[in-house]
Amino acid sequence: MGICDPIHQLGMWDDFNSSFPSTSATMILEVDKCLEDQIPIMEKRLDNETEDTSHGTVGTSNRYEPETSKPVEKVLRRLAQNREAARKSRLRKKAYVQQLENSKLKLIQLEQELERARKQGMCVGGGVDASQLSYSGTASSGTAVFDMEYGHWVEEQTRQTNDLRIALHSQIGEAELRIIVDGYLNHYFDLFRMKATAAKADVLYIMSGMWKTSAERFFMWIGGFRPSELLKVLTPHLELLTEQQLREVCNLTQSCQQAEDALSQGMVKLHQILAEAVAAGRLGEGNYTLPQMGPAIEKLEDLVRFVNQADHLRQETLQQMSRILNTCQAAQGLLALGEYFERLRVLSSQWATRLREPT
């Protein structure tokens, strides 16, 4: 079973005003001025030559006309080409400057959102001691970005769920519905890629489910939903399944359960090994150095692979269900899945409100 391991990089733009050469603009202006000075002279010279030709003999005009007109036309054509090249160069420079400015604004906005998310994380974790804060500060930069991206992901999922609901009620064409279904699936795949990046920054944060609501955390399995359980949730909402489809859904559910059992057994074994590694220190030392905690840290790195494998199983399950079902059935299943998570989030909100009410 493969492991999804995307790599995200964030490039930094250098300051354009301090690095972009200013001489190019001056050169362009000088070329324009030179062209503007030369064109009237050329036009006047052509007028004089035309006047002289009109007063001269016909034989002389016919004799020297090819030699005179060809160089002049060539020069004028070259001057026109130079002016057009200078104009295009100015337009390219203007577009490049605008692109740099837009990139700077986006980068500043991202840094501001990241700083706000980091401050919010510090407020939420205000109950821990200073040593925990100093440790979590090194890992929170990656998880803060994930928190911000996941918040946007939930908002987009809510919008896509509403679009899917409207599409099913309006009975649009199958081709249009397939576009919506594929977009909904890709939205889940984006989440798996986001989680893979965040797990490398702090896998325990992903495993803890602190980025989800309390009701969602209650049903979590290795950093996300259990595929076989969600198949049971959405299958009753599918209409007119054929016998072949029912068999394939049943086989898929059994395959998911077997894969889940294998991963769960591996997690139990990893839990035992990690506990033994942490407890391996001598009694009374009190000085927990990095070499002493090295074996435990290596086991936490193994935990990243478990999270990625679990997400890979979730992605494969969604893809297989999309293959088994027709377009309308797939839309119904994804709508049931989206509304299920919406109900869990509403349940968490209502439960939290109930706890704040006076008894």
Swiss-Prot record:
Residues 44-72 are annotated as: Disordered. It comes from the Eukaryota. Keywords: Activator, Coiled coil, DNA-binding, Nucleus, Transcription, Transcription regulation. Residues 44-54 have a biased composition (Basic and acidic residues). Residues 73-125 form a coiled coil. GO terms for molecular function: DNA-binding transcription factor activity; sequence-specific DNA binding. The keyword Ligase does not apply. Residues 72-135 form the bZIP domain. InterPro entries: bZIP, bZIP_sf, TGA_domain. Gene3D superfamilies: 1.20.5.170. Residues 74-94 are annotated as: Basic motif. Binds DNA as a dimer. This is TGACG-sequence-specific DNA-binding protein TGA-1A. It comes from Nicotiana tabacum (Common tobacco).
